[in-house]
Regions:
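Single conserved hydrophobic/aromatic residue that forms the stacking wall/gate
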Residues: 1-16
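Basic, flexible Lys/Arg- and Gly-enriched helix-loop patches that mediate nucleic-acid binding at interfaces
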Residues: 19-225
Length: 225
């Protein structure tokens, strides 16, 4: 039952969050002078790249002075930072590992009112990032955090972090299918391929493939198959 599964996951997140705070594992982004864009991202304002844009646009102040130079270092222990006139408040870094069930969407805003992955965790004042996405009908591990720096390092293609997917396909997958995936399949945005693919398990009427991707596009695996 979807609702029972969601309730259990939410209870687990609450317990994990409480334990994390008791053990002192959740830390503030301040630990001496850091680059301004890194501080903003770590505080959950936006991704690192979006924070750089905010700085260049003159929307960030340090000690009541507008800062537009990227790489400027600040220390939240001794300096005040404002974004669009709103003071930046140090917040604990929070991490949730979620086993996303089917029927849940990873988008943070859903006009259709469907269950979102953000609904599975306790209410947090900090803005949470979904590191990677799975479509509504897929299930698997998703990381939610307000650590913008970590989110960027895990999700941005230039860091080369591979994501592993187990995909069940109808029938038996032969070597030709695996080779086609390795060489790349032409999609609307161009030719895309996998980092690695292998047959994990074979059933009478279906096959489980293990597929590794370095960069995930919208419903990429479904469209490739």
């Amino acid at each position: 039952d979807l609702h029972l599964s969601l309730r259990r996951q939410r209870q687990m997140c609450i317990r994990d969050s409480s334990s994390q705070r008791r053990n002192g594992k959740a830390i503030s982004p301040s630990g001496g002078p850091e680059r301004l864009q890194k501080v903003l991202a770590a505080a959950g304002i936006a991704s690192r790249r979006q924070c750089e844009k905010l700085i260049v646009e003159g929307r960030v102040e340090v000690d009541q002075r507008v800062i537009t130079k990227l790489g400027t270092k600040v220390d939240l222990e001794t300096q005040s930072v404002q974004v669009d006139g709103v003071p930046l408040v140090q917040s604990q870094l929070v991490y949730y590992v979620i086993n996303k069930p089917k029927g849940v969407v990873c988008t943070h805003r859903d006009p259709s009112g469907r269950m979102r992955i953000i609904d599975l965790v306790p209410d947090e004042t900090a803005r949470m990032f979904s590191v990677g996405r799975l479509d509504r009908e897929s299930e698997g591990l998703i990381l939610l955090t307000n650590d913008g720096g970590l989110a960027q390092q895990l999700a941005h293609p230039r860091y080369g972090v591979e994501k592993t997917y187990h995909v069940q396909v109808a029938g038996l997958a032969d070597r030709a299918i695996l080779q086609r995936l390795r060489e790349g399949v032409k999609l609307a945005e161009g030719k895309v391929g996998v980092a690695a693919v292998r047959i994990k398990r074979v059933y009478k009427q279906s096959t489980i493939l293990e597929i590794n991707l370095r960069e995930g596009k919208n419903r990429e695996i479904r469209r490739m198959l």
